[in-house]
Amino acid sequence: NKFENQVKIINEDIKNYKNIFNRDEFDTIVTNPPYFEFTGDISQTNDLEQLANARHNIDLTLEEIIKISSYLLKNMGSFSIVFRSERMVEVLALLQKYKLEPKRMKNCYTKWNENSKICLLEAIKDAKKGFSIEMPIFVYDENRQKNEYIENLYKSSDLKIKKE
């Protein structure tokens, strides 16, 4: 996708960010953090440790992700996040706490007749106020067919990322 020379994969614990990166170093941060808040009850997680860490913020909280992102982003840098709709209030409060101004959001619906489970949100560091809720994404239509919009996303996302 012609970004091979602009993307560098770093396999490191994000909590070491101050040892690796400078403040205000990035123009854009995109994150798909664990969706579920960990309450301390291990029975709420999957038996497989990798899946538990991927689904529950056991080792890294949502607040840590947003705080670190704010530190790393340049002024007017873009922060994009995917999260569970049920955590909307928490996400908005944390973004504003760390000077990431919510700018636009899309709700995602698995089916046209169900509530939104996932939200996509973009915030800008140190931006002026102004927020829009964009047209939603429906994964499946009323005939249980994958939505044309989703099909086109899959077709256009032929990512080729080079690991270093």
Please provide the spans of the model-predicted regions.
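Residue-level signal for inorganic ion chemistry
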Residues: N32, I65, A123
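Mobile active-site "lid"/loop adjacent to the S-adenosyl-L-methionine
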Residues: Y35-E64
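Amphipathic alpha-helical repeat scaffolds
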Residues: N1, T31-F36
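Conserved SAM-binding strand-loop segment of SAM-dependent methyltransferases
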Residues: K2-N19
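Short helix-capping segments at alpha-helix termini
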Residues: N1-N5, K97-L100
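A short acidic, Gly/Pro-enriched loop at the edge of an enzyme's catalytic core
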Residues: N16-I29, E37
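SAM/dcSAM-binding transferase cores
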Residues: S116-E164
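Conserved Class I SAM-dependent methyltransferase catalytic core
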Residues: I58-S116, L120
